Regions:
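Aromatic (phenylalanine/tyrosine) cluster motif
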Residues: 3-7, 16, 20
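An N-terminal, well-structured beta->alpha segment
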Residues: 20-84, 88-89, 166-187
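Active-site flanking residues adjacent to catalytic metal/cofactor-binding acidic residues
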Residues: 31, 69, 120, 191-194
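Ferredoxin-reductase
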Residues: 54, 60-136
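Gly/Ser/Thr-enriched, mixed-charge loops and adjacent short helices
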Residues: 129-208
Length: 208
């Protein structure tokens, strides 16, 4: 692994106290960011990632940034650190809660932002987590992931004070499915979401 040692980001002492942070180069994958929660994805790293994403969002004239998450135990804490970083740039956070990735993608077409991130470890073991990032309804390329890393290394962040609010996007997602799918017959089904984020929306979708 290649590690970059960065001095504490100015103005972030209220979020964390270490004098420097360790940034594992291996968390920056081809199209997302992924690593072991609390080991690779530390408070300092995730906060700085939030600063980079918020700064990039504002640069693209997106003053609102959507954040969703999966059901992993580490996801609420990563959300807290990430959202604080985004807010510190003056970018607003739209919290859509625990949602599967398709609902997150739907949100970027139906809320006041086309950019955001879903916190998810995907198929990886329970101690992993990660970040799938969208800007302007597009998944980030490997070049964009590397640019985000460079922002963190250079501390190329905007400063400001954003606001956060929560919204339920699931109802909009349900309506989109209902308008697109017509069942010829009623169905009796059983669902096993395997502890995935779909568990919080599947019953609502099928009952509707």
């Amino acid at each position: 692994s290649i590690y970059f040692y960065l001095y504490r980001l100015k103005g972030c002492h209220q979020i964390y106290n270490p004098a420097f942070m360790r940034l594992n180069d291996n968390i920056f994958r081809a199209n997302d960011i992924r690593g072991i929660a609390y080991e690779d994805l530390t408070q300092e790293v995730v906060f700085a990632l939030g600063q980079a994403l918020g700064s990039e969002s504002i640069k693209r004239n997106q003053n609102n940034f959507i954040i969703g998450r999966d059901g992993r135990i580490s996801s609420p804490q990563l959300f807290a650190w990430l959202s604080e970083g985004v807010l510190s740039t003056g970018c607003n956070v739209i919290d859509i809660g625990i949602v599967p990735s398709p609902v997150f993608y739907h949100s970027t077409f139906n809320l006041n932002s086309s950019s955001g991130v879903v916190i998810t470890g995907s198929h990886n073991p329970a101690d992993y987590n990660g970040f799938k990032i969208l800007f302007e309804n597009r998944s980030t390329s490997s070049e964009e992931i590397q640019a985000i890393k460079q922002k963190i290394i250079e501390k190329d962040f905007i400063s400001g004070k954003g606001k956060i609010h929560s919204t339920d996007i699931v109802e909009s997602y349900i309506n989109a499915i209902k308008n697109d799918v017509n069942l010829l017959h009623s169905l009796n089904i059983s669902i096993d979401c395997g502890n995935g984020a779909a568990g919080v929306v599947a019953e609502r979708v099928y009952k509707s």
